[in-house]
Amino acid sequence: LRRFSKKEDKIRFKEKISVSENFFPDNKKVFWVHAASVGETNSVLPLIEKLIKNNKEIFILLTSTTLSSSQLIKKKKLNNDNFQHRFFPLDVQFLVKKFLNHWKPKLIIFIDSEVWPNYLLEISKRKIPLVLLNGRITTKTFKRWKIFPNLSRKLFNSYDLCLPASSE
């Protein structure tokens, strides 16, 4: 439905359901940063720009879920040999495995607080370092997660480092 309402890129939509055969950095460590929306993308771009500028041995893969975030990245003209933007593949187990097998990230940074169960479980299983940057949770959401304590514990223990948006 999003594709037909022009909220998706007609050509790049397939990135959400498969791994495209774009440039792959064979000789560099892949650091994967996921910022779901345009606001999260905008907030993490200064960090990405610094990483690209100061670390030639790493490759930054930035994923997002929205067309507007992709358009923002195009405007910033970040695409070079050390950076690539892709759309975040759907949180479906076989797609998650295919994506992680292709990119083989050495570090993963998720921005804000969306929870992707299949990604978190597979990342944890592969022991890939995972950081939550600018994490936050509302009281209402916290109460909901308390209903499923075992699942919550398993998912949130996937993170190696959580840097909250505030101390509250």
PLM regions and their residue ranges:
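Active-site and donor-binding regions of nucleotide-sugar-utilizing enzymes
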Residues: R2-E168
